[in-house]
């Protein structure tokens, strides 16, 4: 007998969690739980405001419809809404035992704040130092100076940078001007520096700074292929789609000689733990980009190793559908 429950959650986040044009006051999403023959599987459906095309109410409506089909024994078609496709596929994979338990919790450290604070955080990273720094929020020249300062101060540091398509080509060049050419190879990649792919390609060609595709991966016309100056693709499953779709992209990237990085869309600790399992399974040896739990004020159902945030249980969830 099949049983399904859809819950809604609301997690408080730290003040000042900025998206593109707004600040998050809470992280709202859905959890799905499937039961069948004594087995259980969970998944998270959490569209990210300003990044997901679907809203949370739209995702909830679609999930309820698909769960009703599943509950009576059907095999529902994959949802066209990425967050719904991802969450349901995770729940089904846990139910069937096809999502391996092994997880890669060693994420690239997400760095925010002033350079002195960043230096202290980065200096304390044990072993290989891989960190992610958001750029494009301030002046490009300032970003270039800070990146240069960090690379100069920490010779064993490698950086992933993310500009979210925020720069014109002129601003991107202003950033590069302040990064010592001798240290640019320690920038593993800069995600989408410019507003268009062609400008980003030209930037990589002219500066020697490798780039990665992030937003482009979700464009309808995107194809995974080897290109000069392109080092990686970033896969954010909540924004991309089902486990099967993500696995397909990883395979295509590896066949093209590119790295694939599993990355967070500010999911709860439950969703993040599933992303860590995906990373260990699909991209072993590549640190995922999952260091977003520090933005939360609580964990949800499943604890992240060594995290000291309080763990919220099922009593904090609201049931929105059951069958």
UniProtKB/Swiss-Prot annotation:
Query: What are the BP-aspect GO terms?
Result: menaquinone biosynthetic process
- Which co-factors does it depend on? a divalent metal cation
> This protein's superkingdom?
Bacteria
Q: Does the keyword Lyase apply?
A: yes
Answer whether the UniProt record assigns the keyword Nucleotidyltransferase to this protein.
Answer: no
Which Gene3D superfamilies does the protein's record reference?
Answer: Enolase-like C-terminal domain, Enolase-like, N-terminal domain
Q: Which residues does Mg(2+) bind? A: 162, 191, 214
Q: What pathway does the UniProt record associate with this protein?
A: Quinol/quinone metabolism; 1,4-dihydroxy-2-naphthoate biosynthesis; 1,4-dihydroxy-2-naphthoate from chorismate: step 4/7; Quinol/quinone metabolism; menaquinone biosynthesis
Q: Which UniProt keywords apply?
A: Lyase, Magnesium, Menaquinone biosynthesis, Metal-binding
Q: List, from the UniProt record, the residues annotated as the active site of this protein.
A: 134, 236
One Pfam family name is MenC_N
**Which reaction does this enzyme catalyse, per its entry?**
(1R,6R)-6-hydroxy-2-succinyl-cyclohexa-2,4-diene-1-carboxylate = 2-succinylbenzoate + H2O
Q: What's the stated role of this polypeptide? A: Converts 2-succinyl-6-hydroxy-2,4-cyclohexadiene-1-carboxylate (SHCHC) to 2-succinylbenzoate (OSB).
* HAMAP family assigned to the protein according to its UniProt record, in alphabetical order: MenC_1
Name of the protein: o-succinylbenzoate synthase
Give the classification, highest ranks.
Bacteria, Pseudomonadati, Pseudomonadota, Gammaproteobacteria, Enterobacterales
